Curated annotation (Swiss-Prot):
Activation and inhibition: Allosterically activated by N-acetylglucosamine-6-phosphate (GlcNAc6P).
The entry's keywords: Acetylation, Carbohydrate metabolism, Cytoplasm, Hydrolase, Isomerase, Phosphoprotein
Pfam families reported in the protein's UniProt record: Glucosamine_iso
Annotated protein name in UniProt: Glucosamine-6-phosphate deaminase 1
Gene for this chain: GNPDA1
Keyword Ligase part of the UniProt annotation: no
NCBIfam families xrefs: nagB
GO CC aspect terms: cytoplasm; cytosol; extracellular exosome
Length: 289
């Protein structure tokens, strides 16, 4: 398990975006080998998405051979509703990059048979070869996706009734009116995310400091579902200073002492543009023994 501590939200977002960029470039995806990426919604990943869009526009990264699977979606909201997660992803990320629409997978909260939709989503993940990197965020109560306190730590994609704390937290997106907030959602399970070959969890802000403490310094507990990722062989927690306020000083000092090593994970790699330039130049070289 790695804990990456950056001073500010913007730095944490950039580190996370660089990590995703490097993983995609290292994977070297193509028509016969797609990179599969799990993605969250919410305010936390917005900075990361903006940096990824920047890398694409600069010619440093392509999403042409990337398949995405989103964590969750509300039940009952039309796809084009401004607060649906489908709208969120397209407005904040997908429409700004070169990903093919058929390669984006978001649960349908208006499906006739909701559990069948969840089962089909699991099958699509399997058919894609599993998730290479699942990126997630958490709530102040440590929930990941809509796996709220008390959720099974081996759960799969399913229909979930939302806790009142979540409904209250989400009311700000629905004009502050609780009656407008969906009370159910479709969500990947903790087990679904745990199956990914790698997991990166973004945690920023003082209001999530206690959740980070539960995830890092205490044991695995289904009342804090994020704690399950202590047991994943390749988990990276990325946070800002504010999120570390509940951690012990020696814990923060220990992980900060590893940053010289961890920062090598986001060292610049060849961009798409640089690869094409190198290939073009090598093709012009005269033949020699």
């Amino acid at each position: 398990m790695k804990l990456i501590i950056l001073e500010h939200y913007s730095q944490a977002s950039e580190w996370a975006a660089k990590y995703i960029r490097n993983r995609i470039i290292q994977f070297n995806p193509g028509p016969e080998k797609y990179f599969t990426l799990g993605l969250p919604t919410g305010s936390t990943p917005l900075g990361c998405y903006k940096k990824l869009i920047e890398y694409y526009k600069n010619g440093d990264l392509s999403f042409k051979y990337v398949k995405t699977f989103n964590m969750d979606e509300y039940v009952g909201l039309p796809r084009d509703h401004p607060e649906s997660y489908h709208s969120f992803m397209w407005n904040n990320f997908f429409k700004h990059i070169d990903i093919h629409p058929e390669n984006t997978h978001i649960l349908d909260g208006n499906a006739v048979d909701l559990q069948a939709e969840c089962d089909a989503f699991e099958e699509k993940i399997k058919a894609a070869g599993g998730i290479e990197l699942f990126v997630g965020g958490i709530g102040p109560d440590g929930h990941i996706a809509f796996n709220e306190p008390g959720s099974s730590l081996v759960s799969r994609t399913r229909v979930k009734t939302l806790a009142m704390d979540t409904i209250l937290a989400n009311a700000r997106f629905f004009d502050g009116e609780l009656t407008k907030v969906p009370t159910m959602a479709l969500t990947v399970g903790v087990g679904t995310v745990m199956d990914a070959r790698e997991v990166m969890i973004l945690i920023t802000g003082a209001h999530k400091a206690f959740a980070l403490y539960k995830a890092i310094e205490e044991g695995v507990n289904h009342m804090w579902t994020v704690s399950a990722f202590q047991q994943h062989p390749r988990t990276v927690f990325v946070c800002d200073e504010d999120a570390t306020l509940e951690l012990k000083v020696k814990t923060v000092k220990y992980f900060k002492g590893l940053m010289l090593v961890h920062n090598k994970l986001v060292d610049p790699l060849y961009s798409i543009k640089e690869k094409e330039t190198e290939k073009s130049q090598s093709s012009k070289k005269p033949y020699s023994d």
